[in-house]
Amino acid sequence: MTKVLLGFMGVGKTTVSKHLSMHCKDMDAIIEAKIGMSIAAFFEQHGEIAFRTIESQVLKDLLFTNDNSVIVTGGGVVVLQENRQLLRKNHQHNILLVASFETLYQRLKHDKKSQRPLFLKYSKEAFYEFYQQRMVFYEGLSDLVIRVDHRTPEEVANIIEGY
């Protein structure tokens, strides 16, 4: 069964996936190859709704492949009801990586490379509300929750591989 890594933007899903011995499919990389530009540029040119539509199709395609790989999702994959339904069908194989809000905020604030559109859009207070809303979805879909604040990516990868 395919395992799915879930978590808020900046939690380390992509970083952890690089330490897994299992085959990983990074949705953001797949989407960027499909659209021919960065996600940030696509957001700016076409908007979030257009992006979520593509993201949903990619998730569906990857889940139906069912090849014992790990799908590394983007932080907003839980936004659409359709995606949450797809993830519920993957019951017992959804893994949530969790970090404290302050850890995430500092990572995103200092990440000059990614410049995530939804992070740049909000004040810290509004971003916290956004974080809390998303966490409700993640927690409702997750079968294993791994706190990453005081763990190395290698330690998190070992937990995932043992699950």
Curated annotation (Swiss-Prot):
Gene name of the record: aroK
Keyword Transcription regulation: no
One GO location term (cellular component): cytosol
Keyword entries, A-Z: Amino-acid biosynthesis, Aromatic amino acid biosynthesis, ATP-binding, Cytoplasm, Kinase, Magnesium, Metal-binding, Nucleotide-binding, Transferase
Protein name, per record: Shikimate kinase
The organism of origin for this protein: Streptococcus pyogenes serotype M4 (strain MGAS10750)
Subcellular location: Cytoplasm
GO molecular function terms noted in the UniProt entry: ATP binding; magnesium ion binding; shikimate kinase activity
Enzyme class: transferase
